[in-house]
Amino acid sequence: ATYKVTLVTPSGTQTIDCPDDTYVLDAAEEAGLDLPYSCRAGSCSSCTGKVTAGTVDQEDQSFLDDDQIEAGFVLTCVAFPKGDVTIETHKEEDIV
């Protein structure tokens, strides 16, 4: 399945198509968006976003703690959409 992922970035909001087997960060790059990232392995906070609607699967992440996940934070480099989802990007400063 392919879902609509709405990315709320500092430079505006854009909605992209993201298959359920593609990481949000990869789909964003294919769509020409320039989102922050570093390790691409779910083990740092460079790509942190915050889910404001919908859900993602980020089982591969190893950086965020349970409280951060419950608050909606997501590592876009290892997040698969589980439906239509809205993510605010560039949220690394909010989790430190």
From Swiss-Prot:
For this UniProt record, give its keywords in alphabetical order, as a comma-separated list: 2Fe-2S, Chloroplast, Electron transport, Iron, Iron-sulfur, Metal-binding, Plastid, Transport
Q: Which GO terms describe its molecular function?
A: 2 iron, 2 sulfur cluster binding; electron transfer activity; metal ion binding
Q: Which residues form a coiled coil?
A: none
Does the keyword section mention Membrane? no
Q: Give cofactor(s), names only.
A: [2Fe-2S] cluster
An example GO BP is: electron transport chain
Report domain 2Fe-2S ferredoxin-type positions: 3-93
Q: Where does this one sit in the cell?
A: Plastid, Chloroplast
How many cofactors are bound and how? Binds 1 [2Fe-2S] cluster.
Q: Which domain of life is it from?
A: Eukaryota
An annotated GO cellular component of this protein is: chloroplast stroma
Indicate which residues the UniProt annotation says bind [2Fe-2S] cluster. C39, C44, C47, C77
Membrane-traversing stretches: none
Q: Which Pfam families has this protein been placed in?
A: Fer2
Similarity remark:
Belongs to the 2Fe2S plant-type ferredoxin family.
Functional description taken from the UniProt entry: Ferredoxins are iron-sulfur proteins that transfer electrons in a wide variety of metabolic reactions.
Protein name listed in UniProt: Ferredoxin-1
Which species expresses this protein natively?
Phytolacca americana (American pokeweed)
